[in-house]
């Protein structure tokens, strides 16, 4: 069975996309519909990293999208950057029931660990054990010292994806540690969130995704180079290359 392929952007509500990707003068309240109108079937909720959204907002986004739509959700920075994975149960008890309001549209949950914080395997073990086993999870390990066989072994044990990423001229390894792959593309230049991927660069990713199709259950790719509306245009081009 071929893998389910989901390609989208990290967020949809960017005022600077109005006139660049969305129709001119698109109000923020209409941007989700404008995003959907371009044929996207997934998005990564990035604002959940900074603050917990209102339940009413999650309900509204859930109800505005089709039954086939998938929301990937970025985990709260309280868990990853403030607590640094320590004592995760109280934070998860607040976070998980809230995002579960998305129902069957809830896709992978991404936890991004901070740069300049090296491995703490005991904390990682405790955090992984605390995660409910009813969801898919991915870890974006921004500090390269986490890119080790010991960390990958732990992710593999729990069927958690090692998030492949490109940011500010740095590229993570490509490691498959779960029955799905998760990719975040923050831009091809030395400045994060800027620049547009070339067709040649996107073809490289398309070839890799095609290779994964036969061995994985799903592949999720999210573009975060929101500057000048590059992210959604790059996402649509990658979808075209995979068609």
Predicted regions and their residues:
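Residues lining hydrophobic/aromatic ligand-binding pockets adjacent to catalytic sites
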Residues: 1-243
